[in-house]
Amino acid sequence: MLLRMSTLLLRTLREDPADAEVPSHRLLLRAGYLRRAAPGGYTWLPLGKLVLDRVAEVIRTEMLAIGDQEVHFPALLPAEPYRTSGRWTEYGDDLITLVDRRGAEHLLAPTHEEPAALLVKELFTSYRDFPVGIFQIQTKFRDEARPRAGLLRGREFLMKDAYSFDLDEAGLQAAYDRHRSAYQKIFARLGLDYAVVHAVSGAMGGSASEEFLATSKIGEDVYVGCTACDHTANTEAVTTLAPPASNPEERPATQVHDTPDTPTIASLVGLANARALAGRDDWAAGDTLKNVVLTIRPPGAAKSELLVIGLPGDREVDLKRVAATLAPATVTVFDGWADHPELVRGYLGPQVMAKLGVRYLVDPRVVPGTAWLTGANEPGRHATNVVCGRDFLPDGTIEAAEVRPGDPCPACRTGQLTLRRGIEIGHIFQLGRRYTDAFTVDVLGPEGQSVRPTMGCYGIGVSRAVAVIAEQHHDERGLVWPTEVAPCDVHLVAAGRGPQVETALGLGNRLAEAGLRVLVDDRGHVSAGVKFTDAELVGIPRTVVVGRRLADGYAEVRDRPSGKRADVRVDALVEHLVNEVHSG
């Protein structure tokens, strides 16, 4: 393959686009890989399409290697299967829906579990047909409220999704392990630094799931590691170690105190110590019980319901953790104080939740026998020694508090948690029988009995992976593509006119005939300096400069990742580059 920049659909930019927030977005636009077509939608230009196709081919190769077969489902699907599974409402506002001229409702599919289950139901009737593994690389859609960060958070994106069907849990586990191993090979080939972390299943359903998170300072996901063991988890999936419970009746009696002008935890702790409430002057924020009011709207519900969460006052509520726990319900911060005078803002306590009929969930650290300084449900008043199990009975526990560095590891219980940011590039799930139950997918077992297959699903964001590679492989001058996914193997720069251009084109043709992918900068209207700047911005791994040393029979080979340069004889250049590319 030979591309000439004099005719290539490519325009580089000298300045960062104003709306580009993250490095990958800035560089992919500046280097001419993408153009914004709409909010959350991008046109792939030739170099970008080459990278996208190469990433997809790496994924396709590894999926075929584990025995999955490639299919292609429609992107436009009828609503009914998604109503049957419940996801028509569970996906909420993220689902893009439409009505055709006949009045029938459709959706632009975000994932394809439903059609995959229906396909297996239609094709297979016997246990002899299993296991089954299928995958597709398909455009998906999500109605993002605020598309941002270029390819990392768009409304339209390319995704690989695979589905496994097995007759029992052992088969599902084997399929899950195969795909997990394949993902590790894929991300290694793509040159990505990543972590595999425990995750929640969310609207997908099922039991076990893991995310593959590419390490990145701009990542929206936060995950934990442990200083003493190999435990990793998305913070949404972190469990809190609870202290031992004790006898609530052994605690002192509750006392109510006047605490004017203390609507915040800091002001309350300051007053409590100044006045030595309950005979103490060592109160800390962690001794207080903060009560946070949220609104919850289950899928398809006509109205929201109130939820109050009690947690130690030194912790903030992490709404992402709450949303993950309560999915698929929509969670928002309560702002209807004027309509609920029974909820005393700033002085809310747990003692009245049952009387008010408000659902009350607490942090796992709030166990029977723990005593708290908390609101007395009267303006300007708080109570000490409000004891869980005596003065209030929660409706349950919830993982809602922020996770902090130094928190105890829930796996080994000896190490401390560390926090890092990452970008989700893959997610694998053990779905179980949620979808085969929904569509009554049954086959004949070996003893003539009815057997219901169990499913797994395995997703990779293909277009997102392009952006993530760009995030991890760039420098101050531009992109630095790994060889496996670079749009071309060699970038030939004719640093002059006449013989330099002719030699560069001749070398390009010979390299293309040898099986390499070549980009030749044969533009006659730009300076050598601009060509060198563009070569670094575009980020092809090897640049060959045909310039002033051509008269001596030499060209300069520049290695983009390391910056090393070497003069190579022109008559040996093709063999040199072919060997270099093929050796890795």
Curated annotation (Swiss-Prot):
Main localization (coarse): cytoplasm
GO molecular function terms listed in the Swiss-Prot or TrEMBL record: aminoacyl-tRNA deacylase activity; ATP binding; proline-tRNA ligase activity
Catalytic function, reaction form: tRNA(Pro) + L-proline + ATP = L-prolyl-tRNA(Pro) + AMP + diphosphate
Spans annotated as Disordered: 242-261
Transmembrane helix listed as a keyword: no
Annotated EC: 6.1.1.15
Pfam families (UniProt xref): HGTP_anticodon (PF03129), tRNA-synt_2b (PF00587), tRNA_edit (PF04073)
Compartments where located: Cytoplasm
Biological process, per Gene Ontology: prolyl-tRNA aminoacylation
A cellular component annotation (GO) from this entry: cytosol
Keyword Repeat attributed: no
InterPro entries, alphabetized: aa-tRNA-synt_IIb (IPR002314), aa-tRNA-synth_II (IPR006195), aa-tRNA-synth_II/BPL/LPL (IPR045864), Anticodon-bd (IPR004154), Anticodon-bd_dom_sf (IPR036621), Pro-tRNA-ligase_IIa (IPR002316), Pro-tRNA-synth_IIa_bac-type (IPR004500), Pro-tRNA-Synthase_IIa_type1 (IPR023717)
Subunit structure: Homodimer.
The protein's role, per its UniProt record: Catalyzes the attachment of proline to tRNA(Pro) in a two-step reaction: proline is first activated by ATP to form Pro-AMP and then transferred to the acceptor end of tRNA(Pro). As ProRS can inadvertently accommodate and process non-cognate amino acids such as alanine and cysteine, to avoid such errors it has two additional distinct editing activities against alanine. One activity is designated as 'pretransfer' editing and involves the tRNA(Pro)-independent hydrolysis of activated Ala-AMP.
Domain remarks in the Swiss-Prot or TrEMBL record: Consists of three domains: the N-terminal catalytic domain, the editing domain and the C-terminal anticodon-binding domain.
Protein name per its UniProtKB record: Proline--tRNA ligase
Annotated source species: Salinispora arenicola (strain CNS-205)
Top-level taxonomy: Bacteria, Bacillati, Actinomycetota, Actinomycetes, Micromonosporales
